[in-house]
C-alpha cells in the first residue's frame, strides 16, 4: 500500500485531503482513494505510474473520457479522481470534484482552439490553389494549370461508353470542378462523335448567352481605371475573352465565377441531350411481374435522373410513381408500409418478392381461391350434394346398412327373384325394362318399335279427282268405329291392328 500511496506527499497530500467529494459534502479525498485508483488502472490495463505526473493524468483523462457516457459508475469515479489529482499536481485551487471537472473542461477547450488555429495557419501556409485549375505560384500570383490529358481521356471514354446516358452529367460536373471557360471548351472539343448532340448543346449555350446579355446590359460610359469590364455572354462562353480575363474575373474582388456560369449552361444543354438519348418517360417505367424490386428501383432512378424537373417534383415522383408502377405483389406490400417509407424500408420489405418461396405462397393462395370459387358455384347450381347417399339392405329392405351387416334373419333364396336354389349373383332372371318387358326379347324387336313395316300403297284415286268416289267397305267402317282416340300411340304398346 505504501508504493501505491506514494503518488502524493507533503503539501500536495495536504491539498488532496482538503478537497471534498461532492459540493457541500462532508466526505473528502483520502489516501485510500489513490490506492483504489491504482488498482482500477491495473484492471483497465493502464499504467498506475501515470498518476504521479500531471502529463500522465492528462493521458489517462484522454483515454477514459470517450467511454464516460457508456461507462460504469466505477469508470466515472476514476475519471473524476484523476481530474482532481491533475489539479493538485498543477496546484490549481479547487474545493470539490465539480470545480476540478470544470477546470479540466476549460483547459481542454483552450487546447482544442490552439490546435485548430495551428492547423488553419499550417493549411494557409501550405495552400497552393484557391480554385483549381487556377493555382497560386510561389510569388503569390494566380496562374492557370491546363486541364490534364488524363481528365480529357476520362471524359471522352465516358461519352463513348455511356453515349449521353443520365450518368454523364455528374461525371462531367466532377471532371470540370473549378475549370475555366477555356478548359470547358477543351472538354467539349474532344468529343469526336455525336455531332448532332453537340450542335444541340451549342444552341443551348447561345440561348443562355443571349439571355445573360438581356439581363445584364452594358453600363454606359467609360470603365473606371483599374476596374475590369463586365463579362458578356460570349465572354462567359470563352469565345471573346482571353484566359487572363477569365482568371481575373474568377479571382477578382468581387469575383465573377464565369467558369461556374458556363458550366451551368453546359449542364442545361446536356440535360436536353440526355432527354433526347433517353426517350423513355418516367411514367413508362413499370415493374415486370417477375422483375426483382431492386432492378425496378435501379431503372426508375436512372430514368428519373434524365427528367428535367425540380427536386420537389422528383421527390413527388419517387413517393407516388415508385409505388404506383410496382407489380401487384410489391404494391400490396408498399401500400402496407404507408406514406413516408424510405427506399431502404421498401427494398427490405420487397426483398423476397419473386423468389421461389413467394411464388409458392402466391400459387397456394390462387389455388385456394379457385377451389373456394368452384365450390361456391357448385353449391349455387345445386350440384353439390351435401348429404351422403344412404345404402339399402337387400336382406331386410331397410336403409342405413348393407346385407353383410344386417342383424335380421337371413332371407332364403335369391334376393332378386325370391326363388330358392340359387343366389342373386347366379340369378338368370333378367331385369325388366321400363315397358315391363325383358330386354332383349326373343320375339324380335322391342315393343316400342314397329313390329312390321307396312308396304307403301298408292293414295286413293278420289284424292286426285280420278273416277268416282269409292264406297267404303263394311269392314273398314267397323274398324273406323273402333279406332281409339290416340291411334298413333298404339305402336308403342303392342301390335298395331291397322298395320296388320
From Swiss-Prot:
- In this record, residues modified by a lipid of the kind N-myristoyl glycine are 2
**Motif (Nuclear localization signal) spans which residues?**
26-32
Stretches the record annotates as Interaction with host AP3D1: 12-19
What residue spans carry the region label Interaction with membrane phosphatidylinositol 4,5-bisphosphate and RNA? 14-33
What does the similarity note say? Belongs to the primate lentivirus group gag polyprotein family.
Name the site position(s) for Cleavage.
Answer: 132-133, 363-364, 378-379, 433-434, 449-450
Q: Where is this motif: PTAP/PSAP motif?
A: 456-459
Q: What the record says about its domains?
A: Late-budding domains (L domains) are short sequence motifs essential for viral particle budding. They recruit proteins of the host ESCRT machinery (Endosomal Sorting Complex Required for Transport) or ESCRT-associated proteins. p6-gag contains two L domains: a PTAP/PSAP motif, which interacts with the UEV domain of TSG101 and a LYPX(n)L motif which interacts with PDCD6IP/AIP1.
Give the organism the record lists. Answer: Human immunodeficiency virus type 1 group M subtype H (isolate 90CF056)
Record-listed Asymmetric dimethylarginine modification sites:
388, 410
Q: Where is the composition biased (Polar residues)?
A: 109-118
- State any GO BP term from the record: viral budding via host ESCRT complex
Q: Which intervals of the chain are annotated as region Interaction with Gp41?
A: 7-31
Residues of the region (PPIA/CYPA-binding loop) are 217-225
Q: Where is this region: Dimerization/Multimerization of capsid protein p24?
A: 277-363
- Other comments on record: HIV-1 lineages are divided in three main groups, M (for Major), O (for Outlier), and N (for New, or Non-M, Non-O). The vast majority of strains found worldwide belong to the group M. Group O seems to be endemic to and largely confined to Cameroon and neighboring countries in West Central Africa, where these viruses represent a small minority of HIV-1 strains. The group N is represented by a limited number of isolates from Cameroonian persons. The group M is further subdivided in 9 clades or subtypes (A to D, F to H, J and K).
Protein name, entry field: Gag polyprotein
Q: Which domain of life is it from?
A: Viruses
**Zinc finger extent (CCHC-type):** 391-408, 412-429
Give GO cellular component annotations, separated by semicolons. host cell nucleus; host cell plasma membrane; host multivesicular body; membrane; viral nucleocapsid; virion membrane
- List where the motif Nuclear export signal lies: 16-22
Q: Which residues form a coiled coil?
A: none
Q: Where is this region: Interaction with host PPIA/CYPA and NUP153?
A: 189-227
Amino acid at each position: 500500500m505504501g508504493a501505491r500511496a506514494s503518488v502524493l506527499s507533503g503539501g500536495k497530500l495536504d491539498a488532496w485531503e482538503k478537497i471534498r467529494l461532492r459540493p457541500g459534502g462532508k466526505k473528502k479525498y483520502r489516501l485510500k482513494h489513490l490506492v483504489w485508483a491504482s488498482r482500477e488502472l491495473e484492471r483497465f490495463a493502464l499504467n498506475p505510474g501515470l498518476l504521479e505526473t500531471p502529463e500522465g493524468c492528462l493521458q489517462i483523462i484522454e483515454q477514459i473520457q470517450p467511454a464516460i457516457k457508456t461507462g460504469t459508475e466505477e469508470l466515472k469515479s476514476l475519471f473524476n479522481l484523476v481530474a482532481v489529482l491533475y489539479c493538485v499536481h498543477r496546484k490549481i485551487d479547487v474545493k470539490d470534484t465539480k470545480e476540478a471537472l470544470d477546470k479540466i473542461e476549460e483547459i481542454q477547450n483552450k487546447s482544442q482552439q490552439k490546435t485548430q488555429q495551428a492547423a488553419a495557419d499550417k493549411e494557409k501556409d501550405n495552400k497552393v490553389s484557391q480554385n483549381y485549375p487556377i493555382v497560386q505560384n510561389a510569388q503569390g500570383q494566380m496562374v492557370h494549370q491546363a486541364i490534364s490529358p488524363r481528365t480529357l481521356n476520362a471524359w471522352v471514354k465516358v461519352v463513348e461508353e455511356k453515349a449521353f446516358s443520365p450518368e454523364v452529367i455528374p461525371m462531367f460536373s466532377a471532371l470540370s470542378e473549378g475549370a475555366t471557360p477555356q478548359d470547358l471548351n477543351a472538354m467539349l472539343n474532344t468529343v469526336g462523335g455525336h455531332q448532332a448532340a453537340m450542335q444541340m448543346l451549342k444552341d443551348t449555350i447561345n440561348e443562355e448567352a443571349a439571355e445573360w446579355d438581356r439581363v445584364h446590359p452594358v453600363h454606359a460610359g467609360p470603365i473606371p481605371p483599374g476596374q475590369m469590364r463586365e463579362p458578356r455572354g460570349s465572354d462567359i462562353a470563352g469565345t471573346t475573352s482571353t484566359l487572363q480575363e477569365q482568371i481575373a474575373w474568377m479571382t477578382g474582388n468581387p469575383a465573377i465565377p464565369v467558369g461556374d456560369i458556363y458550366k451551368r449552361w453546359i449542364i442545361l444543354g446536356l440535360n436536353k441531350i440526355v432527354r433526347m438519348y433517353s426517350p423513355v418517360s418516367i411514367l413508362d417505367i413499370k415493374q415486370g411481374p417477375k422483375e426483382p424490386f431492386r432492378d425496378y428501383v435501379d431503372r426508375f432512378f436512372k430514368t428519373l435522373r434524365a427528367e428535367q424537373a425540380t427536386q420537389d417534383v422528383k421527390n413527388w415522383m419517387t413517393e407516388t410513381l415508385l409505388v404506383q408502377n410496382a407489380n401487384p405483389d410489391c404494391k400490396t406490400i408498399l401500400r402496407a408500409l404507408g406514406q413516408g417509407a424510405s427506399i431502404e424500408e421498401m427494398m427490405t420489405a420487397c426483398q423476397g418478392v419473386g423468389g421461389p418461396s413467394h411464388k409458392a405462397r402466391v400459387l397456394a393462395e390462387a389455388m385456394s381461391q379457385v377451389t373456394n370459387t368452384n365450390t361456391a358455384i357448385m353449391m349455387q347450381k345445386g350440384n353439390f350434394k351435401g348429404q351422403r347417399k344412404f345404402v339399402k339392405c337387400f336382406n331386410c329392405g331397410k336403409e342405413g346398412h348393407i346385407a353383410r351387416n344386417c342383424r335380421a334373419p337371413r332371407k332364403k333364396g335369391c334376393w332378386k327373384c325370391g326363388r330358392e336354389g340359387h343366389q342373386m349373383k347366379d340369378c338368370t332372371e333378367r331385369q325388366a325394362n321400363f315397358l315391363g318387358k325383358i330386354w332383349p326379347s326373343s320375339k324380335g324387336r322391342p315393343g316400342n318399335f314397329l313390329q312390321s313395316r307396312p308396304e307403301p300403297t298408292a293414295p286413293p284415286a278420289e284424292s286426285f279427282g280420278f273416277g268416282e268416289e269409292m264406297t267404303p267397305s263394311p269392314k273398314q267402317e267397323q274398324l273406323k268405329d273402333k279406332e281409339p282416340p290416340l291411334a298413333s300411340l298404339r305402336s308403342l304398346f303392342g301390335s298395331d291392328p291397322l298395320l296388320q
